[in-house]
């Protein structure tokens, strides 16, 4: 097979709850993650040697071994036992970097899916999700995509009903600002640690509460979901760009909910349909420009990384 192209969608967190600290030192999370159609695009081409090379149309992106695309390619090749395999990979970057939208994780997941097909390895999606969990907490979700309950570090997935309406999100981000995810979790522990749960039994009770909430039904405009993001409580007070984005989104009419995604600084408003979303974006055009904020109208997606036909 010569060349394969894969779409790598971003995600938003519709729910992010920090339950406590696990025995391995990671935070125990309870989340609802949703794929959106803001997406990167990766192409994979076979090479005559074992080299793994990555190029990108965004010169600010690191292309070395710290990039999840390269790390995913190396892991897949190692796990499959074919170290002679190589590939030339090109990344068209559309998801903003350091935005809380899992762009890097989605690109890494796309590398697993794309190279699995390019090299004819035959791994199942569950195999690829397991490999993804070794590389990043968001990566198994990015392989699966759609609407998912995510537990543990984020790697334990429970599918939710597919979205049955044409809901849309208006994303807003300051391109000059990024938020360190490790810092956000450290700050969360400092400020909210006294309310953390302790032990697997307590974690499971809280997971069950989330399972029993409205998330078990398809998201509908008539009954908007109860958004929650524990990290927003600690990031917003210390990040003026998040404050500005949430303030502007909260002024819009017709929003179903407004929240920060992940560790930020991207924020979003949920709308009943793409037309309402686009109208809201137009309404805010001058204010967004004055604040130096970028925006995207996005539809919800039912899947994760996908090989293009």
UniProtKB/Swiss-Prot annotation:
Pfam families: GHMP_kinases_C, GHMP_kinases_N
Keywords for the protein's UniProt record, in alphabetical order: ATP-binding, Isoprene biosynthesis, Kinase, Nucleotide-binding, Transferase
Pathway(s): Isoprenoid biosynthesis; isopentenyl diphosphate biosynthesis via DXP pathway; isopentenyl diphosphate from 1-deoxy-D-xylulose 5-phosphate: step 3/6
List of residues binding ATP: 96-106
Source superkingdom: Bacteria
UniProt KW Nucleotide-binding keyword: yes
Catalytic activity: 4-CDP-2-C-methyl-D-erythritol + ATP = 4-CDP-2-C-methyl-D-erythritol 2-phosphate + ADP + H(+)
SUPFAM superfamilies documented for this protein: GHMP Kinase, C-terminal domain, Ribosomal protein S5 domain 2-like
Record-stated family: Belongs to the GHMP kinase family. IspE subfamily.
Functional note: Catalyzes the phosphorylation of the position 2 hydroxy group of 4-diphosphocytidyl-2C-methyl-D-erythritol.
Listed name of the protein: 4-diphosphocytidyl-2-C-methyl-D-erythritol kinase
Source organism: Parasynechococcus marenigrum (strain WH8102)
Taxonomic lineage from the root: Bacteria, Bacillati, Cyanobacteriota, Cyanophyceae, Synechococcales
């Amino acid at each position: 097979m010569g060349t394969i192209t894969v779409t790598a969608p971003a995600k938003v967190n519709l729910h992010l709850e920090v339950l406590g600290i696990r025995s391995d030192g990671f935070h125990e999370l309870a989340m609802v993650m949703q794929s959106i159609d803001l997406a990167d695009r990766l192409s994979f081409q076979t090479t005559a040697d074992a080299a793994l090379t990555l190029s990108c149309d965004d010169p600010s992106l690191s292309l070395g071994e710290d990039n999840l695309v390269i790390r995913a390619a190396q892991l897949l090749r190692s796990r499959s036992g074919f170290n002679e395999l190589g590939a030339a990979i090109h990344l068209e970057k559309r998801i903003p970097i350091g935005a809380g939208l899992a762009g890097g994780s989605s690109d890494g997941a796309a590398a697993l899916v794309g190279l699995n097909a390019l090299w004819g390895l035959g791994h199942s999606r569950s195999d690829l999700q397991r490999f993804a969990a070794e590389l990043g907490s968001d990566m198994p979700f990015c392989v699966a995509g759609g609407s998912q309950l995510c537990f543990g570090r984020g790697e334990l997935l429970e599918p939710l009903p597919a979205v049955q309406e044409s809901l849309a999100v208006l994303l807003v981000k300051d391109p000059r600002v990024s938020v360190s995810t490790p810092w956000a979790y450290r700050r969360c522990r400092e400020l909210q640690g006294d309310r953390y749960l302790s032990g697997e039994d307590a974690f499971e009770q809280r997971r069950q509460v989330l399972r029993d909430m409205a998330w078990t039904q398809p998201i509908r405009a008539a009954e908007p979901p109860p958004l929650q993001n524990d990290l927003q409580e600690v990031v917003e007070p210390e990040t003026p760009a998040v404050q500005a984005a949430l303030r502007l989104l909260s002024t819009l009419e017709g929003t179903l909910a407004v929240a920060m995604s992940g560790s930020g600084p991207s924020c979003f408003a949920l709308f009943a349909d793409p037309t309402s979303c686009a109208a809201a974006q137009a309404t805010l055009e001058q204010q967004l420009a004055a604040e130096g904020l970028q925006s995207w109208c996005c539809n919800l997606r039912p899947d994760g990384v996908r090989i293009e036909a």
